[in-house]
Swiss-Prot record:
The gene is TAS2R7. It comes from Gorilla gorilla gorilla (Western lowland gorilla). GO terms for biological process: detection of chemical stimulus involved in sensory perception of bitter taste. Belongs to the G-protein coupled receptor T2R family. This is Taste receptor type 2 member 7. The keyword Ribosomal protein does not apply.
Length: 318
C-alpha cells in the first residue's frame, strides 16, 4: 500500500515539475529575448528572470530528491551525493524566497503612494540598486546554506539509517535536539523574508486605500491606471504569501519526517506539496505582467491556429 502511495505521489510530483518548468522557462525566455533585442533589461524583468531561474533549479532539486529517495534509498541514507543535493536545495529555496520578497519590495516602492522623504529617496533609487540587492540575496543565501546544510544533513541521514538498525535508535533520539535547533534556524531564516513581504503587502493596502480616497474626493473615479497597478501588485504579493505558507508547512513535514513511522512517505508527501509553490506562482506572475500576458496569449493563439489548421487538413483528406 505504501509503495502505491509513493508511486502516486511521485507521478504527481512529475506533473507539478513539468508545469513549473513550463511557466518559469517561459518567463526567463521572454525576458532574455527582450534583453537581447533591446540590449538592456528593466528592473522588474531582472527580478522575474532571477526568480524564474532560481525556481527552475529548485524544481529540479526537489524532483531529484524524490527520485533518489524512491529509486536509490541507500544512496539517500548514506551517499555523499545527498550533501550536494541538500546544499543546492537549501540554496535555491532561500534564493527563490528572497527574490520573491525583492519583487514585493519593488512593487511597493514603484507603485506605493507615500510622501515620506525616505520613501521618496528609495523610490527614486530602487532601479539603480536592485541588481546589488539581488546579489546581496545570493550572498546571504550561500552564507545560510553552507553551515545549516552540513548539520541538517548529518542528523537526518543518521536517523534514516536508524530506521533500519534498531541499535542506533537511542543515538538518533539524542541527535533530535541538535536536529531541531538546526531546523529552527532554517525556518527562522525563511520567516524573515516572509515578514518583509507581509509588511509590503499591508503598506500597499494602505497606499491603495489612500489613493482611492483621493480619487473619490477629486471625483475622477477609482479605476485609474494607478489603482489597477495597485490591484495587480496586491494579487501577486498575496498569492506569494498564501503559497509560501503551504510551502512552509510542507518544508516542516519534510524536515521533520524522521519523527514519523513512514519516513520516506512523509518526505515525498511534503515535497509533492512543496512543488505547488514554485510551479503555480509563475503563472500568477505571467497573468499579472502586461508583457508576459500578451506574449502568452500570442503563443496560445498561434498554437490553436496550428492545431485548427491540422484538423482542417485531416478533415479535407477524409
Amino acid at each position: 500500500m505504501a509503495d502505491k502511495v509513493q508511486t502516486t505521489l511521485l507521478f504527481l510530483a512529475v506533473g507539478e515539475f513539468s508545469v513549473g518548468i513550463l511557466g518559469n522557462a517561459f518567463i526567463g525566455l521572454v525576458n532574455c529575448m527582450d534583453w537581447v533585442k533591446k540590449r538592456k533589461i528593466a528592473s522588474i524583468d531582472l527580478i522575474l528572470t532571477s526568480l524564474a531561474i532560481s525556481r527552475i533549479c529548485l524544481l529540479c532539486i526537489i524532483l531529484l530528491d524524490c527520485f533518489t529517495l524512491v529509486l536509490y534509498p541507500d544512496v539517500y541514507a548514506t551517499g555523499k551525493e545527498m550533501r550536494i543535493i541538500d546544499f543546492f536545495w537549501t540554496l535555491t529555496n532561500h534564493l527563490s524566497i528572497w527574490f520573491a520578497t525583492c519583487l514585493s519590495i519593488y512593487y511597493f516602492f514603484k507603485i506605493g503612494n507615500f510622501f515620506h522623504p525616505l520613501f521618496l529617496w528609495m523610490k527614486w533609487r530602487i532601479d539603480r540598486v536592485i541588481s546589488w540587492i539581488l546579489l546581496g540575496c545570493v550572498v546571504l543565501s550561500v552564507f545560510i546554506s553552507l553551515p545549516a546544510t552540513e548539520n541538517l544533513n548529518a542528523d537526518f541521514r543518521f536517523c534514516v539509517k536508524a530506521k533500519r538498525k534498531t541499535n542506533l535508535t537511542w543515538s538518533c533520539r539524542v541527535n533530535k535536539t541538535q536536529h531541531a535547533s538546526t531546523k529552527l534556524f532554517l525556518n527562522l531564516a525563511t520567516l524573515l523574508p516572509f515578514c518583509v513581504c507581509l509588511m509590503s503587502f499591508f503598506l500597499l493596502i494602505l497606499s491603495l486605500r489612500r489613493h482611492i480616497r483621493r480619487m473619490q474626493l477629486s471625483a475622477t473615479g477609482c479605476r485609474d491606471p494607478s489603482t489597477e497597478a495597485h490591484v495587480r501588485a496586491l494579487k501577486a504579493v498575496i498569492s506569494f504569501l498564501l503559497l509560501f505558507i503551504a510551502y512552509y508547512l510542507s518544508f516542516l513535514i519534510a524536515t521533520s519526517s524522521y519523527f514519523m513511522p513512514e519516513t520516506e512517505l512523509a518526505v515525498i508527501f511534503g515535497e509533492s506539496i512543496a512543488l505547488i509553490y514554485p510551479s503555480s506562482h509563475s503563472f500568477i506572475l505571467i497573468l499579472g505582467n502586461n508583457k508576459l500576458r500578451y506574449v502568452s496569449l500570442k503563443v496560445i493563439w498561434k498554437v490553436m491556429s496550428i492545431l485548427k489548421g491540422r484538423k482542417f487538413q485531416q478533415h479535407k483528406q477524409i
